[in-house]
Amino acid sequence: MIKWPWKAQETPQQDNPPWEDALAIPILHSLTTEEQTRLVALAERFLQQKRIVPLQGFELDSLKSARIALLFCLPVLELGIEWLDGFHEVLIYPAPFVVDDEWEDDIGLVHNQRIVQSGQSWQQGPIVLNWVDIRDSFDASGFNLIIHEVAHKLDMRNGDRASGIPLIPLREVAGWEHDLHAAMENIQEEIDLVGETASSIDAYAATDPAECFAVLSEYFFSAPELFAPRFPSLWQRFCQFYGQNPLLRLRNSPNNDASPTTNVH
């Protein structure tokens, strides 16, 4: 069990979100005008339904809130905002945070450990994030903290805990599980050859199926050119689940020549 040392500060009154500025981040460059319009509509509903809570002196403004909402809604652009049910608050630390982790081993001994976290989500309860990693999620590099935690939430809709298999038709579960485990094995083989830091896919994906789904969801939306050719069968399953094809969107985008790693603050 993790004990969270948060102390919420009063959420400031937000002005009307500057959506045009909020959309001007690399990960959203390839969206069509129609998709941007629908994404903003979802993000507006997100901000009406959820409370973004700044912690430890983090200064929240309307632009930050808008970008957070847009990234939360990108994975559910075709699924619908109801897929984000089950939580009401998003807690934002200014940077990765230390928490007390309490766990019991196989013989019943209770251990306490202080660990650094970037984010956390539960089936019922808030999503906890940090601004440093949110800001690093604006580019198209394969890293996206918000999409990672949203993927866990979507995964948990299929049961009590994240399993790596989201809510899909029963007839597709065996194929999904097979392709996901094959991807994990492939990533682990690369790690064994080159090491974790040199792996072309975040090594965290090889730790368990739930993390593989969450990590590959990051790549699905922010680096589809790395995901699709490497795991084509799993890629098609992700396209079917999310109802989106970010690689096709990227290829058809007039912004395709824009640098995918532009830093936005």
UniProtKB/Swiss-Prot annotation:
Disulfide-linked positions: none
Binding site for Zn(2+): 111, 148, 152, 211
Protein function: Involved in the modulation of the activity of the glucose-phosphotransferase system (glucose-PTS). Interacts with the transcriptional repressor Mlc, preventing its interaction with DNA and leading to the modulation of expression of genes regulated by Mlc, including ptsG, which encodes the PTS system glucose-specific EIICB component.
Name of this chain's protein: Mlc titration factor A
Source species: Escherichia fergusonii (strain ATCC 35469 / DSM 13698 / CCUG 18766 / IAM 14443 / JCM 21226 / LMG 7866 / NBRC 102419 / NCTC 12128 / CDC 0568-73)
Biological processes annotated in GO: proteolysis
Enzyme Commission code: 3.4.11.-
CDD domains noted in UniProt: Peptidase_M90_mtfA
InterPro entries: MetalloPept_cat_dom_sf, MtfA_enterob, MtfA_fam, MtfA_N
Cofactor note: Binds 1 zinc ion per subunit.
Family assignment from sequence similarity: Belongs to the MtfA family.
UniProt keywords, alphabetically: Aminopeptidase, Cytoplasm, Hydrolase, Metal-binding, Metalloprotease, Protease, Zinc
HAMAP family: MtfA
Gene symbol of the encoding locus: mtfA
Gene Ontology CC terms: cytosol
